[in-house]
């Protein structure tokens, strides 16, 4: 998950530098990096919630 945050930060930096230097390609690359990092983070969150739910269901079945 830290890698996803790093990718977002890197994207933010690229976007800012691209904006300041009027480099539209770098700005767009930064936007893409940020979006990719956010998407990966969202997928990781869904995986974690699914695993928590599976563990909870397994725990309830163990008590029966």
UniProtKB/Swiss-Prot annotation:
Residues 22-64 have a biased composition (Basic and acidic residues). Residues 1-64 are annotated as: Disordered. Pfam families: CsbD. It comes from the Bacteria. InterPro entries: CsbD, YjbJ_sf. Disulfide bonds: none annotated. Belongs to the UPF0337 (CsbD) family. This is UPF0337 protein SH2043. It comes from Staphylococcus haemolyticus (strain JCSC1435).
């Amino acid at each position: 998950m830290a890698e996803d945050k790093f990718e977002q930060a890197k994207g933010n930096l690229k976007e800012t530098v691209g904006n300041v230097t009027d480099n539209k390609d770098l700005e767009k690359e930064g936007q893409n990096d940020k979006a990719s990092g956010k998407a990966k983070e969202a997928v990781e969150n869904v995986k974690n919630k699914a695993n928590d739910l599976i563990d909870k269901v397994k725990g309830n079945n163990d008590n029966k």
